[in-house]
Swiss-Prot record:
The modification Phosphoserine is found at residue 364. It holds the Pfam family SH2. It comes from Mus musculus (Mouse). This is Tyrosine-protein kinase CSK. It catalyses: L-tyrosyl-[protein] + ATP = O-phospho-L-tyrosyl-[protein] + ADP + H(+). Disruption phenotype: Mice die between day 9 and day 10 of gestation with several defects including a non-functional neural tube. SRC and FYN kinases show increased activity when CSK is missing. GO terms for molecular function: ATP binding; identical protein binding; metal ion binding; non-membrane spanning protein tyrosine kinase activity; proline-rich region binding; protein kinase A catalytic subunit binding; protein phosphatase binding; protein tyrosine kinase activity. Residues 9-70 form the SH3 domain. The modification Phosphotyrosine is found at residues 184, 304, 416. Belongs to the protein kinase superfamily. Tyr protein kinase family. CSK subfamily. It is found in: Cytoplasm; Cell membrane. Phosphorylated at Ser-364 by PKA, leading to increased activity. Autophosphorylated. It is an enzyme of class 2 (transferase). ATP binds at residues 201-209, 222.
Amino acid sequence: MSAIQAAWPSGTECIAKYNFHGTAEQDLPFCKGDVLTIVAVTKDPNWYKAKNKVGREGIIPANYVQKREGVKAGTKLSLMPWFHGKITREQAERLLYPPETGLFLVRESTNYPGDYTLCVSCEGKVEHYRIMYHASKLSIDEEVYFENLMQLVEHYTTDADGLCTRLIKPKVMEGTVAAQDEFYRSGWALNMKELKLLQTIGKGEFGDVMLGDYRGNKVAVKCIKNDATAQAFLAEASVMTQLRHSNLVQLLGVIVEEKGGLYIVTEYMAKGSLVDYLRSRGRSVLGGDCLLKFSLDVCEAMEYLEGNNFVHRDLAARNVLVSEDNVAKVSDFGLTKEASSTQDTGKLPVKWTAPEALREKKFSTKSDVWSFGILLWEIYSFGRVPYPRIPLKDVVPRVEKGYKMDAPDGCPPAVYEVMKNCWHLDAATRPTFLQLREQLEHIKTHELHL
């Protein structure tokens, strides 16, 4: 086996591990944390030609940067890798063997349901401390109270504060990976000190979306404070590390705070959601070229997801954002999964979801195609809610009997044909996104959209 690392191909993204001031004129200086893109290999394998975010090119040392990788699919990321759930006192003691002072884990309490137990190895034996849950706060001594388990563990890591020892080494639950370690390893961890949060631009059930500044660039930041919700959003962030396309909202990085906060930092989309953009401008402002361009933007993003075996599951105009220069980009990867998995259908948007996905939880690229047809209808109706004048409870029974919405007012017949093809009840007869893109490009070339 050769120990020589394979050369990074052109287009590879790297993140700087150290500052590099450059010594020669052809060098490209950079700061720790900068993202650089490889342009070409040089004769010397220790140096690459690269460019920075403003397009300046130069030579960089390979050992000063690390390649950015996607977080591996299937990696079980955890904000609390030391949390072992429902295990018994005896199981906890076996896990903390051989004894090592400061080795710890947290489990659910068996004697006091709803409470937790902190188990710590100390001078050859294991101590079990009950963590009481009272008035939405956690405490061991009823003197110091914490919002969540992460804050509690962080406190006792810095100071024993009455315990037999401070917490030194987490006993990681088998099969899980500490989220911060994994984002750092793969080059996606950002530095909180360099992020300025400026103003709230959206509120969700999970937390706020804020306009921020990261190293002089405008960014959007999802701020998730609740540890359980943050855990769910880790999956979204790890999917985003694997995806890169000009019509997908780009992840810039992730910040995992010791106290349990999670910040997902993405490019800032100045003109907001496509549905609001359409409603606020309407027919008098947006012509046929503009509507078809948005349709193609989304289709190209979905063709990329299709080619990479990802299913979005929540495609709708509310989950497409518009940039300063009027490019539509697909966002909200909260439900995006590798194509093979199934999902609970409790919270699915009925009017956008394919019948087989609602009925049998069968999600596939073809169920995304159904949703794309609905999204086309939203675009050409300037942001109307689909199935107007039909009560929500009646939508699925009517659709399953073959009902299809009429064309929106003024919708070109060729575009309406594309919509209807997306709404075949038999998923297998729906077109692929590649075919849809070709159909939309044909419409554009022959000016059938005007």
